[in-house]
A protein has these predicted regions:
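Catalytic machinery of carbohydrate-active enzymes
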Residues: 1-351
Length: 351
């Protein structure tokens, strides 16, 4: 049997959807399990023992209809028995359609339902602490008679990687016996990034409470923005921030985060990666993102999160995520650090 799981686009999505492979491997130990992902997301699923092959979706297929068509025809030649389309967008619709698999599973959408043999309606509520992002993905396994209530993404780092990153930190002045906290200072876009002045206040609070060593999660092209947040911090806070120590690649970031006591900051892929490494997290949600979907494995003092809706629910009454998105920046101004100062302190003293 050959099974293809499709999850394009974001790193956090690719990591989250990787939970399907452990369940598929348990059900079909001898099957060929392949994962179709964007090439830049590979580091979060590297060394996963349940994935046989990675099928890489590149910028060429992303930007060219002709390249996408050729790619879909290549998938058809693989003769998959089952295709699970988690992404469920136009490109993956086309790939699934061309696959000619006997079993084709995805989320229900009126315009694409004819492509799939099984169309699964997303749950809108759950009592599971794993969150809706996990619950809805696991529902895609039901047509294969696989029923699981919860599953947690895992990242597989080698002992060599961990030792190399440990030496990198210690030779650059980090004391691993003292608290080390990674700050997700920037979101994936402006409307997913906590205002710089507010983030600086959060970092000030973290250092004042814990005297922790601070690392920033950013890539070289984001140095200007990261430095701007650094400059807004108090002088005594700046003395605790190791600006020059950052992951120059996604895999480097994972290895550095594995040595941290917590990751705190903007919701996004970095938070999901930290959770997959069993690192404590405190997440600040964008004002327009649905917290119920992405606050996976919420647990007091372990994985906590805050959203403006927690403190000012009247601003969201009867409004959809789509309606809130254009107001994101205006809403951020109302989402002051003082609103969750007490909750953050309670989290910090448990590190």
């Amino acid at each position: 049997m050959k099974i293809l799981v499709i999850q394009q686009k974001m790193i956090g999505d690719v990591l989250t959807s990787s939970i399907l492979f452990e369940a598929l491997r348990a059900k079909y130990p001898n099957a060929q399990l392949d994962y179709l992902v964007n090439s830049h997301t590979v580091p979060v699923i590297e060394n996963n023992p349940n994935i046989d092959n990675l099928v890489l979706f590149t910028n060429e297929e992303e930007s060219s209809k002709l390249a996408l068509l050729k790619f879909a025809k290549k998938i058809k030649k693989q003769q998959y028995d089952v295709v699970i389309d988690v992404y469920s967008k136009l490109s993956s619709n086309l790939i699934t359609l061309f696959s000619a698999a006997k079993t084709k599973i995805s989320y229900y959408k009126s315009y694409s339902s004819f492509i799939y043999t099984h169309n699964i309606k997303r749950a809108t509520k759950t009592d599971e602490n794993c969150g809706l992002a996990i619950v809805n993905r696991l529902q895609l396994l039901k047509p294969l008679d696989i029923t699981i209530a919860s599953a947690k993404p895992k990242i597989y780092l080698t002992s060599e990687e961990l030792e190399t990153s440990k030496q990198f930190l210690t030779t650059n002045g980090i004391n691993l016996k003292m608290p080390l906290i990674m700050i997700s200072v920037l979101g994936s876009g402006e409307n997913k990034t906590y205002p710089f002045a507010y983030m600086a206040k959060v970092i000030d609070q973290i250092v004042a409470t814990t005297e922790a060593q601070i690392l920033f999660n950013y890539i070289p092209k984001q140095e200007k923005e990261a430095k701007a947040i650094f400059n807004l911090c108090k002088a005594e806070t700046q003395a605790h921030i190791y600006m020059h120590l950052f992951g120059k690649s996604l895999r480097d970031f994972l290895n550095l985060t594995a040595h941290c006591h917590a990751l705190i900051g903007n919701e996004g892929g970095a938070v999901n990666m930290a959770k997959a490494l069993n690192i404590k997290t405190f997440t600040i949600f964008s004002t327009w993102i649905d917290k119920d979907t992405w606050n996976i494995f919420e647990e007091e003092t372990i994985n906590e999160s805050v959203h403006l809706k927690d403190y000012k629910p009247e601003l969201y009454s009867g409004k959809t995520e789509k309606e809130m998105k254009p107001q994101a920046m205006k809403l951020y101004k109302k989402f002051t650090p003082e609103l969750f100062q007490q909750k953050l302190d309670a989290f910090l003293i448990k590190i």
